[in-house]
Amino acid sequence: MAKSPRRVAGRRLLLPLLCLFFQGATAILFAIFVRYDQQTDAALWHGGNHSNADNEFYFRYPSFQDVHAMVFVGFGFLMVFLQRYGYSSLGFTFLLGAFALQWATLVQGFLHSFHGGHIHVGMESLINADFCAGAVLISFGAVLGKTGPAQLLLMALLEVALFGLNEFVLLCLLGVRDAGGSMTIHTFGAYFGLVLSRVLYRPHLEKSQHRQGSVYHSDLFAMIGTIFLWIFWPSFNSALTSRGDGQPRTALNTYYSLTASTLSTFALSALVGKDGRLDMVHVQNAALAGGVVVGTASEMMLTPFGALAAGCLAGAISTLGYKFFTPILESKLKIQDTCGVHNLHGMPGVLGALLGALMTGLTTHEAYGDGLQSVFPLIAEGQRSATSQAIYQLFGLSVTLLFASAGGVLGGLLLKLPFLDAPPDSQCYEDQMCWEVPGEHGYEAQEALRVEEPDTEA
């Protein structure tokens, strides 16, 4: 595996310079703008008339722990299925997540909690930043193995900014309801990544085809990610919902939807599989589609039956997408979707947005009673009818797709800059490009025996 001195020198400097520059810049911005909010500032908290039990920390922190584990353990392990890319899948998840959390705190803070010349942060800030990091990691899944760490950091820089802007437009300007992020997280992250992958299309990626598959143990590790995500998804969707009835209803709807998507995934996987055998790719991914599809509607009066029906449909669509639609994406649309984010996050996210609009249009005062204020405040206050709110929900989906597509194009053009050291076509999906790998010299000897055409740079 020959490495030119220029490439080695560039890699040695580029990633450290970007990491140190971004960390230094965010640290300066934190020093200037970021302050504790009323519930975490010692003087402000003790100056108020309340007990320690009233602090939001004790209500939000359990959900934050679950969401945090999903972002770093769930997403990270879900992407280790590639046989020679486990270090990068986990390591770059760690890197992107850490940077995205800091940058999202600033972007979301300026848009949502900036007053008195400062950004005020608390538990909700941490959860919102994790949501943003989740969207970045969804996009990472679409370009997994085909991008270097410097490219990924720049992708995160752009995506976090656009995520924050899209979220602000939907939630604050349009008054859209999206508790579990079917639109703001899953749809945005998926289509940002898919358009990015299209712009970065590699016509000679078959040179790395022998590394694109999984092996027995890599699929087992990926199932760890699946189980983590499956267990904690009710916390993900309910993390920022209201106290009282809102949070438990959101958790229940997500819980039942996940169970249904799992059963439909097993059923469809066996039905379309060779000789009726299950495909681990389907189980690892499509079983989670139930959590995505109820994201928007999870806090609404979906009913347990509605949650089961939505999850069953999402699991089926996701499984069929992996079997039939992913090959079409690559062959016809030239979108190389490494992790199949279109099947797990894209289509279920859009379906979830449509489900949310449907449930919004069916909203009645009788069904929600006094709880209407916490779920649909604009309807409760008489500013909108249920039908008009449903139209706003659909418009929010359109805005999200627009932001994601435009961002993906811009990001793709940015990541094509030649100095960013993209891996060559023959070395995609390979940890040795960036990591010290145990036993790599023996592996290099085997690789040297392969007859390959000259590399084509991205």
From Swiss-Prot:
The chain crosses the membrane at residues 14-34, 62-82, 87-107, 125-145, 150-170, 179-201, 220-240, 252-272, 283-303, 305-325, 347-367, 394-414. This is Ammonium transporter Rh type B. Interacts (via C-terminus) with ANK2 and ANK3; required for targeting to the basolateral membrane. SUPFAM superfamilies: Ammonium transporter. It is found in: Cell membrane; Basolateral cell membrane. Glycans are attached at N49. GO terms for cellular component: basolateral plasma membrane; spectrin-associated cytoskeleton. Residues 416-424 are annotated as: Interaction with ANK3. Keywords: Ammonia transport, Cell membrane, Glycoprotein, Membrane, Transmembrane, Transmembrane helix, Transport. Its main location: membrane. GO terms for biological process: ammonium homeostasis; ammonium transmembrane transport; transepithelial ammonium transport. It is a multi-pass membrane protein. It catalyses: NH4(+)(in) = NH4(+)(out); methylamine(out) = methylamine(in); CO2(out) = CO2(in). Ammonium transporter involved in the maintenance of acid-base homeostasis. Transports ammonium and its related derivative methylammonium across the basolateral plasma membrane of epithelial cells likely contributing to renal transepithelial ammonia transport and ammonia metabolism. May transport either NH4(+) or NH3 ammonia species predominantly mediating an electrogenic NH4(+) transport. May act as a CO2 channel providing for renal acid secretion. InterPro entries: Ammonium/urea_transptr (IPR029020), NH4_transpt_AmtB-like_dom (IPR024041), RhesusRHD (IPR002229). Residues 1-13, 83-86, 146-149, 202-219, 273-282, 326-346, 415-458 are cytoplasmic. A motif (Basolateral sorting signal) lies at residues 429-432. The gene is RHBG. Residues 35-61, 108-124, 171-178, 241-251, 304, 368-393 are extracellular. Belongs to the ammonium transporter (TC 2.A.49) family. Rh subfamily. N-glycosylated. One of its GO terms (molecular function) is ankyrin binding. It comes from the Eukaryota.
